[in-house]
Amino acid sequence: MRTPLKIVLVGLPGSGKTTFGKALAKQLNFAFIDLDQVIEQETGNTISQIFEQEGEGRFRELESIYLKKVLEGIEGFILSTGGGTPCFNDNMELINEKGVSVYLDVSLEEIIRRLGKDAFGKRPMFTNLGDGEAILKLKNLLAARENYYMQAKIKLSGDDISTEQLLSELMVFFRN
């Protein structure tokens, strides 16, 4: 009998953590958990409201609290994290200790295509930024965060990452 895993997806905003995570969870018959949704449900505020009213520092604190809570909970889930989650409060260390981290390494061009004009405006980090500023911000985020993402146990690269690719990589983590 295999032990269910805690699979934690990391990567830039727009890398497909939620979309990919839902598909993978369905394929593995695991629960899908979106960390931002957990934070919103637990606090009663949207991520944007937390950023606006309490600042990024408080958001990162809440993010760490709920990340720890999720990772110490049930087994057999796929967790989609926020793009910055691994980069604060030793979160990547915790993720690697409690689960199998997977970095979705998607090109900036593909992320920009996926996010498009409308999606940039819906994300707190990109609020009130023009297209050029949003693209520059994304490039700066990658430069600042890639060191954390590269600590993931599995790295999947490409603009069309499949669940089959990850399942192949995950086989080593399924234990008898």
Residues covered by each model-derived region:
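ATP-dependent small-molecule kinase phosphotransfer cores
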Residues: 35-96, 117
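Hydrophobic anchor at the beta1->P-loop junction of P-loop NTPases
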Residues: 9
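NTP-dependent small-molecule kinase module
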Residues: 2-3, 27, 143-176
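A glycine- and Lys/Arg-enriched "phosphate-lid" helix/loop adjacent to the NTP-binding pocket
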Residues: 98-144
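P-loop (Walker A) phosphate-binding loop of NTP-binding proteins
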Residues: 12
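Walker A/P-loop
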Residues: 18
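ATP-binding Walker
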Residues: 15
